[in-house]
């Protein structure tokens, strides 16, 4: 008698999360309202979930709540069933701004967090070289950030996050400052890395094409306060390369998302 397959449990569960900022004068700004979603744990399959919405709508605030950097005003965030109350190594964050230390080499930047954790030098070296190889920077391990292009600096940031082996990687418009060709290359790199590392990736963007290209699932958000308007499951394309972006099916999904973004929204 064969065993009954067990249903996948949520790796990440965000339940009725609202976030309100309080200014110095006591004024309140509601950034996120009643956001709920589950991301299932699918062993051997890196999941990319994209939040698509207008600038300033509250996308980044959702990431900060998941990261433990900003406690929800209401609701809760669970990672593998455990409440998130503070930052932890099981979550890593990549920002749009370059965050490398200029006085450290590429490899030293990647190892920095491991060093603070007390990881032995031999293990630090092995783990850093492994992720540098994944992001295509092993030959630049001894270089300094000033010697790198913008895309290479973001590869360093991704490697520095991956070396900690997080369950969830949070990416806040990490490719927004890059030129289009470099951005396409970084998008492809991200998809490759997600398959290797088996991470859950939460990715914030206001670029519709980027959302379609990267996402397994896309959540379309309202203007502030951020609410989930639609969930769109993106087809599992056989090949995700630059030619996909000119295909009829890709453009049809882009149009669908654009229509959702610009449709009249329910009153806040």
Model-predicted regions and their roles:
Residues 1-28, 267-268:
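ABC-family P-loop ATPase nucleotide-binding domain
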Residues 67:
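Helix-to-loop junction immediately C-terminal to a conserved catalytic motif
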Residues 158:
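Hydrophobic anchor residue at the start of the ABC signature
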Residues 169-172:
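Catalytic Walker B motif of ABC-type/P-loop ATPase nucleotide-binding domains
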Residues 75-86:
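Conserved ABC transporter NBD signature motif
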Residues 104-112:
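Short coil-to-helix segment of the ABC ATPase nucleotide-binding domain corresponding to the Q-loop/switch region
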Residues 143-146, 164:
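Conserved signature/switch motifs of ABC ATPase nucleotide-binding domains
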Residues 111, 115, 120-140, 192:
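Conserved ABC ATPase "signature" region
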């Amino acid at each position: 008698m064969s065993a009954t397959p067990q249903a996948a449990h949520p790796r990440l569960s965000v339940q009725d999360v609202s976030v309100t900022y309080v200014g110095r004068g006591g004024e309140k700004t509601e950034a996120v309202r009643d956001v709920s979603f589950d991301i299932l744990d699918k062993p051997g399959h890196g999941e990319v979930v994209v939040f698509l919405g207008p600038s300033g709508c509250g996308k980044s605030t959702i990431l900060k709540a998941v990261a433990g950097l900003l406690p929800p005003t209401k609701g809760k965030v669970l990672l593998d069933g455990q409440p998130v109350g503070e930052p932890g190594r099981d979550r890593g964050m990549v920002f749009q701004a370059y965050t490398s230390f200029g006085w450290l080499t590429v490899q030293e930047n990647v190892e920095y967090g491991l060093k603070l954790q007390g990881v032995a030098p031999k293990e630090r070296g092995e783990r850093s070289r492994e992720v540098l190889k994944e992001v295509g920077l092993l030959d630049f391990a001894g270089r300094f950030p000033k010697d790198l292009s913008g895309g290479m600096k973001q590869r360093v940031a991704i490697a520095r996050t991956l070396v900690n082996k997080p369950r969830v990687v949070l990416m806040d418009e990490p490719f927004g400052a890059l030129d289009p060709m470099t951005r396409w290359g970084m998008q492809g790199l991200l998809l490759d890395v997600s398959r290797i590392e088996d991470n859950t990736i939460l990715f914030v963007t206001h670029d519709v094409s980027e959302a379609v290209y990267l996402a397994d699932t896309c959540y379309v958000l309202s203007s502030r306060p951020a609410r989930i308007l639609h969930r769109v499951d993106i087809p599992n394309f056989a090949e995700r390369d630059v030619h996909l972006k000119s295909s009829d099916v890709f453009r049809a999904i882009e149009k669908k998302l654009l229509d959702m973004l610009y449709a009249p929204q329910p009153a806040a």
